[in-house]
Amino acid sequence: MPTLVVVQSESFFDPRPVYPFINPDVLSAFDRLREQSWQTGALNVPAWGANTVRTESAFLTGLTPEHLGVHRFNPYHRFARETHIPGLVAELKAMGYRCVCIHPYPAGFYRRNEVYPKMGFDAFYDIQHFSPEQKCGQYTSDEAVADFAVKLLENTNEQMFVYIITMENHGPLHLESQPEGPLSRLYTDIPDTNASSDLSVYLNHLQNADRMLQTLQKALIQLPRPAVLGWFGDHVPIMEQVYEHYGYPSGQTEYLIWRTFSTDTPQQADLNVDELGVALLDALVCRIGE
């Protein structure tokens, strides 16, 4: 069975269709992988600007907000009282996978440390596995998280599911300084700096997320085992001044499923995030029949 790596990229979405003055190269790796993907499309998520746990729980369990009722606002508060939580992780465990999560933030936040073992995760690598020197802005860099994941994969012979929850592009964006270097790397037409300061910070981190995607792709190609890479955004960022000045995004994010094997023309399919786990299982199972 293939190695499976899934990245839940903090505040990731493609802002270029909404703001055409953004340099297209900001997401050059994402564009390339999208063209090579097994499946890609827009992703409907139950969160806007925050509340990652709503998107995360829908992905891992396949449960919609309607299923959760009043617990839709913090599903893990309910899940922490359960003894076993069915979903994607349990399915992968039954298929022989060792399931681990990498998230550079305290494990107790959202009670993940209580919920994840009940989902079937074997290990949780939280902020204790990273140093303050590995920050980019306010949080651990995507580069550091990618490097950690690559080393983990390179040093095991086990059949692995690695679930990565990044933090670098988490706000508040206005607390950060403007990115160094020429703004031309972020924009083709420099916007009003007063209205776009948060956008510049966001795009700087978005470009780092794009580099992370490229790092993971290159590493998975080198593994002896075939691999599947899933990538999606949990929600759009909070950038109220940007939205008021330049327009609001739809609230959808993007996803892609890329494989090191048998990829022809990508399937285009817009999904709800609670459907994404099934799509990833399909990408794995297709390998069995080939």
Q: Model-found features: residue ranges?
A:
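Membrane-interface segments at or immediately adjacent to transmembrane helices
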Residues: M1-V6
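Solvent-exposed soluble domains appended to multi-pass membrane proteins
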Residues: S9, R16-Y19, P24-E290
